[in-house]
Amino acid sequence: MTVYERLDRLFEQNNGILKTAQVLENGIAKSTFYAYVRLRGAEQAAHGVYVSPDAWTDAMYLLHLRCAQAVFSHESALFFHDLTDREPSPYSITVRTGYNPAALQADGVKVYTIKKELHGVGIVTLNTPFGNPVPVYDMERTVCDLIRSRSGIETQTFQNALKQYAKRKDKDLRKRMRLHIQHRYCY
């Protein structure tokens, strides 16, 4: 199998999205990869992230690859948990305090920051509509985030999300209370 065939297979295995780090892990030189990118017409979607010309672009997954510490939250998490019928625009993510979100904000991403101790609380991995895994805050954490940030959320989105959450059979009120008691997270 030639190097280009191996790269074709890597793109195929990764739904048309490939990171330079993945190429290097497979023992392929950067110069060979860049020549392949030019020849095949792949596009650079972000630093070190390339998309095949025949692949559907999964913007949520690309955002995750671009900023590994980003966790989908607020309106974006509502979408993942079926607590809203609207696709999020712009995407909402949460990063640790100290991360410089200027480049993400310039690209239209709504960025929230939170202290390091709370950043990892309630993270689950869910699939985007394209089937790619991304980190998302769980339903209880998402409701707490909405309550904390309610002044920056559309009133209709906020009310509908709380109504949908209240109707859910799989909600975990004890978990929400633990978030409140242990971390003083929900008001």
Where are these regions (language model features)?
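Glycine-centered, phosphate/nucleic-acid-interacting loop/turn motifs that mediate DNA/RNA or nucleotide
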Residues: 40
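A detector for short, charged/polar N-terminal pre-domain segments
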Residues: 1-13
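Nucleic-acid-binding surface
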Residues: 6, 15-26, 37, 45, ...
